[in-house]
């Protein structure tokens, strides 16, 4: 259920801060959000897949940590990112 190479490249191009940027918090959060959304669809069809649910919870926690970091560093970038991604924080 991982993202394809094309999907990752599209997300990186959309959220990058500079050319060649793949590690900024915005890119990482956007990739995690796409993976989380894809896994949520998987759980609608496979409700008893507890092994994958653990991975989902890990991704959600990692995204939360990155968002907390970004909020502490630059609140304007944080606000813009959650607005673009449609997160409810």
From Swiss-Prot:
Keywords: Ribonucleoprotein, Ribosomal protein, RNA-binding, rRNA-binding. InterPro entries: Ribosomal_uS15, Ribosomal_uS15_bac-type, uS15_NS1_RNA-bd_sf. GO terms for biological process: translation. One of its GO terms (cellular component) is cytosolic small ribosomal subunit. Part of the 30S ribosomal subunit. Forms a bridge to the 50S subunit in the 70S ribosome, contacting the 23S rRNA. HAMAP family: Ribosomal_uS15_B. Belongs to the universal ribosomal protein uS15 family. This is Small ribosomal subunit protein uS15. It comes from Ectopseudomonas mendocina (strain ymp).
